[in-house]
Amino acid sequence: ALNRQGGFSAAETMDHLGILAGSIEDMWIMARYISETAGGDPGHPGLYGSRTPPPAKKPERLIVLETAGWNETDDASKAAFNDAIGKLSDAGCEIYTRKDDPAIEAYEAETAHSPELWRQLYRFEMRWPMYQYLDYDADKIPPRLKAGIQEGAGLTQAEYRAALARRVYWREMHDALARRCDAMVPLSSPGPGPVGIDQGSAIYNEASSIIGMPAISLPVMTVEDMPLGMQIKGRVHGDEALTAAGRWVSQELLQ
């Protein structure tokens, strides 16, 4: 939705340009400005919606997702998330989980493999020019990135093609389920930010990168005196409606 030309994408079909903002309103204004002036990536229509942030709109139906990250999440973060979902339910939102609908269970079961599919897609696409960087000066490449480059070296074209086909299936499954709700709601991370310079786990963000859906992380919870995010995810090109829902969720949980 936002043009990446002028920057460097390690994996062409997986990377995206995101907005870090002090408010969801500022996020929307900046994203629309970028899309209107630079467009989306070549061949893509860019971000749909008005220049001004959409008004807050209560989401009637929310699908709560555990995703691949739930088993890595600490108990305090799980409790904070469940408490926030309870508040949304008390406010009148209909809440659905994998226990309520076989289609949600099927979606959860499939996207539980997001780490594997993410690695197959990302590692294969990042091989060039990463191979050259590795050959030129391997000592300057961080250990995690170096391991990723080496993992990509073992992937075959057949494996990449299979991963592309699986992504098409994920996108179809996501579109069908997203039509039945106003937003999907997982955590943003397995816990609060780690101490030090480690960027932490991105396991809760992998599915949105694979599918290409809009996702907004809302810092509406606190664990260990640190912010913890709740994501809301929606249909592809449904950014404006998702932003309206996000404004309402933020206002409801932060009041």
Listing of model-derived features with the role each one plays in the protein:
Residues 93-114, 149-150, 220-222, 227:
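Short connector loops at secondary-structure junctions
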Residues 15-22, 150-155, 232-233:
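Short, well-ordered beta-strand elements within core beta-sheets of diverse protein domains
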Residues 108-129:
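Charged, often glycine-rich, active-site loop that binds/positions anionic groups
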